Amino acid sequence: MDIIQHGGDPQVGNLATPINASAFSKAFINNLPGYRQGLSAQRRGLEVGMAHGYFLYGPFALLGPLRNADFAGVAGLLGTVGLISLLTLALSLYGSVGVSTPTATLTTPNPPENLGTKEGWSEFAAGFLIGGCGGALVAYGLCIALPMMYTI
C-alpha cells in the first residue's frame, strides 16, 4: 500500500500526498480568489487586496512605534497604505518582466489564464491597490467606530 504517489509526472516533483490530494484541500485552494474560476484579474486583485489591507492595519496601528500616541490609528492607516503601495509596485514589476502562462498542478488543475499576460497582471495590481487601501480604510473605520458603539 503506497500512500504517496507522484502527481502525474514523477519528474516534476509534485507528490500526491493525503493532504494535498484530498478533496477538501483541492476545494479550499480552488475557492481562493487567485484560483476561482470566472473572476477577472481586477476582481482577483480587489479581493486579495481587501484581505491584505484589512489584516495589515492591525499590526501597524497596535504594534507600531506610534502605538501609544493619540493618532496611532491614522499612523497605522498611513503605514498600511504605504506598504500596500510598495506591494503594488512589486506586483507591477513582476508583471512587466514577461510572465509565462500558469502551469497546471495537482491542486490547481485549471489555473486562471488571465494571470499569464502583462495586461492581466496590470489589472491585478490595480485591483490590489484599490482593494488594499479600501481594506485598510474599513479596518480603520471599525477601530474608530467600535469604541463609540460601546458607549451606547
Curated annotation (Swiss-Prot):
It comes from the Bacteria. InterPro entries: PSI_PsaL, PSI_PsaL_sf, PSI_suXI. GO terms for biological process: photosynthesis. The chain crosses the membrane at residues 71-91, 124-144. It is a multi-pass membrane protein. GO terms for cellular component: photosystem I reaction center; plasma membrane-derived thylakoid membrane. Its main location: membrane. Keywords: Membrane, Photosynthesis, Photosystem I, Thylakoid, Transmembrane, Transmembrane helix. Belongs to the PsaL family. This is Photosystem I reaction center subunit XI.
